[in-house]
Amino acid sequence: VTYGETTVLATVNAAKEAREDISFFPLQVEYREKHYAGGKIPGGFFKREARPAEHEVLTSRVTDRPLRPLFPKGYKNEVQVMITVLQSDGENMPDVLAGVGASAALMCSTIPWNGPIATVRVGRINKDLIINPTREQIEESDLEMVVSGNNETIVMVEGEAECMSEAEMLDSLK
């Protein structure tokens, strides 16, 4: 998935057999921003990529939450969704592309899933709503919200805002 000059690769894989020894759905979503995506190569003592950063773990969770309820009830095959940022322009946020890419990868697969979903970031500057604002626009924005949903409903909302009315918040979800 590419937006501006930011590119994210999303892949999915599922076990052929269900795990009978578990009582939950084993979904693993992993989001990673490789240093090379931003034009950096790890140097010095550490030459390899480190463990996931906090924002990568949080992005994995924000990507997992809207995907999980759309799998069939009782589905127990292990599913892995791997999302890698291949290129980042430093302007467009790759985390919302993770949800779009994961949805597209699941739709292209044979894994049973009741998608697709879309994921967008909503910002607001001077009472004007902006879809997928740039990093610079987010700095000016009094609202930063990530919304995932399909044509029937909103599946997940996560974000923060300065003081605003309930009507303004609901308007930003439309």
Placement of each model-derived feature along the sequence:
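Glycine-rich, flexible beta-strand/loop modules in the N-terminal catalytic cores of phosphate-handling
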Residues: 3-81, 85-92, 151, 158
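Short, electropositive, low-hydrophobicity segments enriched in small/polar residues
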Residues: 8, 106, 114
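Short intrinsically disordered coil segments
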Residues: 44-46, 97, 135-136
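Conserved active-site and cofactor/substrate-binding residues in soluble primary-metabolism enzymes
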Residues: 54, 58-62, 76, 97-100, ...
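Stable alpha-helical structural segments in soluble proteins, enriched in small hydrophobic residues
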Residues: 66, 97-109, 172
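Short glycine/serine/threonine-rich phosphate/pyrophosphate-binding segments
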Residues: 93-99, 116
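Mobile "lid/hinge" segments at catalytic clefts and subdomain interfaces of large enzymes
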Residues: 109-173
